[in-house]
Structures are given as structure tokens and as C-alpha cells.
């Protein structure tokens, strides 16, 4: 298999191989139709420079600009003899349309594009806000695709987001090597009842646009640290203290306002996460959430609510616990795109009726855990058990 693209000698490795697939290209000589890509070179360069969000992450834009310096007109058909199947060129059955022409056009034809009578779907959803593609096919989406759209006088997508690859133990996945891992294999190996842990890891393992790596050890260490030790343990011990000292009940005098430092940190974290999401920085957004949970854990250790209760400072203890429970509500809402099942478990243990995944970040306000009994001893359970623990294996909880 290959990339089905034309390569100049300067595009090859020192050994004369395709840089993406490390295979020797096939030399073909035939008569084809061409698209005058060079005609749109300056327009594409201008568009990239005037619209810094067009190619994300930004360092990929520089790669595309360098490629544009040497851009040439491209063959957009193949002879029927060399390609046995495909869409015939209109008016010339001896030629088949080049795969990247019909593949790219699917983005708009699937929406019902028609130059004379475009569908309502096309008018509603095009131009796309963002097109997410792999870094190895960036040239086709950031050079060829804009040129085709310009030729048709169709608006360009607002952003092309190029993601990196996921390697396995620092090696590129390959069927020939036999190191391809399917998500269901991970779930079966670790006896996960839902995919949240794997989903979380895959979303946080690679900074925006960079490669990420999967290994069993990295997976276990990351999800145990973030989901079990940090977030899960924080909720569990706080709810247990709420039951132990206050019978699981929150009274009006326990509720804190948004002027306290933890509340300020919670609201600040919401804004940081939103800003990260706006820039498609998914892994970085998760780190903001983990940073906040670290802050809350430190707050618990510093204030020592168990000591406050022992000293008879019950109202002070209650306010500390309320701050932590409210923080957990914020953390669950922020984590919902990563761990929808775990976030919902947190919401249910906080006696919340709404769906965690439906919470709008703009509407997150401090002080919304209401007065009344929110839990009891029998209802408290770990939302995420450490992987490889005997309990995790037996309970098949993930």
C-alpha cells in the first residue's frame, strides 16, 4: 500500500523511498489530465498568512508554506489500464479520476453540494468549522483541497487541524510487525466495563498535533494517577467524611460563596479549559483539570477537615468539605468529554439529577450543591478503581 500521490525526486529519502511509507515509488509514464495547481499558489499562501487559525497547530502551517514554494501542477487522472476501477473522467472513458479528487470532494457532495441548487445541509454546514486530519495527509488538505475549492469558488473550511500519530511502545503501528492494538483488546485485557480510561488516555497522551505513544505501563500509570489516585480518591474520602461527620447532609450554613480561594480556582479552571478547547488543545485542557484537582487535594491536606472535626470546629470542617464537593462537581463537568461514564458516576454520587455531559461550561456556577442529604454510607463507591488491583479485576470496573 502507498499514498497514491506524485513524488518528485526531492521528496524521497536518501535511499529513494517514500518518506511516509518507506517504500520505493513506482515509476509510471502515461498521458493524463492536469490541474493547474500553480495558479492558486499565491492565493493559498496569502490565505494561510492572513488566517493564522487556518492550519493548526501553527507549526504545521510553516511546513505547508515550505511545500508551496516548490508546488507544481498535478495529474488528476490515471489511465484505465493502470487503474482498474474508479470514476471515469466525464467525456473520456479512457481515464479514471485521481483518488484524491473524488475523496476530497466527498466533504461537500455528502452535504448535497450542487453548483446550481445546493442543498439546505450544504448551506447550513459549509464551510466547516474544523476538518480533523492526520499529519501525513496535510498536503492534500491544506494545498490541494483549498485549490479545488478556490477553482469552484467555494469557501474554504475555517480550520484544518492536523493530528499526530499514536505509536505502540515508541514504534509505528504496522500490520506486518503485528503491533496493532484495537481499543476492545485494551478493554478486555484490563477488564474495563466502559471505555472511559482508554478514551481518557488516548485524548491526553499526545499534545496537540504531536505524536502520542501507547504502552500498557504508560496507560496504567497515567489513568491510575489521574483517575484513581487523584480524582476518584478525592471524591471517595470527602463523601465518607461528609457521612461520618454530618450524616451525609449539607446545611445552609455550610454553603460557601464564590469569594473563597478554591471557588476562584474552580472558576478560573473553567476559563482555562474553555480557552484550550477553543484552540483544540485537548490534552492540554485535561492537564488544566488535573492541575485543579491537585490544588484541591493539597487544600484538603492543608486544611485537614478530620482534624477540624476532632477539635470540634464542625462548621469550619463542613465548609471545607463543601468546597471539595463543589470542586468535584466542576471537575466532573470538565472531564465529561473525556470520561462521560465516570463523570456521570460522580454526579450521581453528589445527588445531581442532570447529565454531566449536558452541562454547559458557561453555566457552571459555584454553590449549586443544594441543602439536604446528598449521600449515605451504602451509596458511596469508587468511581474508578486502580487497574491491576484485585478489586478492579473482580469488579471489572473501569
Name each model-derived stretch:
Residues 1-2, 8-12, 18-21, 275, ...:
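Basic, alpha-helical terminal appendages of large translation-related enzymes
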Residues 166-173, 225, 255-268, 351-364:
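Short, mixed-charge aromatic SLiMs
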Residues 138, 202-209, 215-218, 241-252, ...:
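Active-site-proximal binding-pocket segments
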Residues 117, 246-254, 345:
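Short, glycine/acidic-rich hinge or "gate" loops at secondary-structure transitions
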Residues 17-244, 287-289:
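Structured secondary-structure scaffolds
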Residues 94, 98, 195, 221-232, ...:
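Amphipathic, non-membrane alpha-helical segments in soluble helical-bundle scaffolds
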Residues 1-3, 164-166, 218, 251-259, ...:
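A glycine-rich phosphate-binding loop feature that marks nucleotide/adenosyl-phosphate handling sites
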